[in-house]
Amino acid sequence: VAGKLEMRECYGQALVEAGRENERIVLLEADLRKSTMGELFRQEFPERLFEVGIAEQNMIGMAAGFALTGWIAVASSFAVFASGRAFEQIRQSVALPRLNVKIGGSSAGLTDTGDGATHQSIADLAIMRALPNMTVLSPADGIEMKGAVKAMLEVD
């Protein structure tokens, strides 16, 4: 049952299901595919997983490039880094030109207690909601996560 699984597992599983249905989906990871469960996508679609290392800004630029060439790019990282480190690139390269880029922010809020304050994100929702042309989804459990991934991929 999805409600008993971790949200990140449901995220990874939902991406795999979507990848089976749509060959235009690519996943970009910022050295966290085991934490975000993008590893599940890599196992099934290794040619559509792009590991960029600890380089969230570059990941967003790459995702924008994929979107410009017809791919559906999903960029995954911890929420604190996806919203904070890559804010300028998201604003300039994704939000303002209205590109079809999806950003998955894992371990949002105070959920990442093991890595400490540097990995906790209390401003990610506010930051992303301040951007034009940005749709923000915030699931509360695994069931909602699977639905959120599906909804995210339907938003153009």
Roles of regions detected by a PLM:
Residues 1-156:
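Thiamine diphosphate
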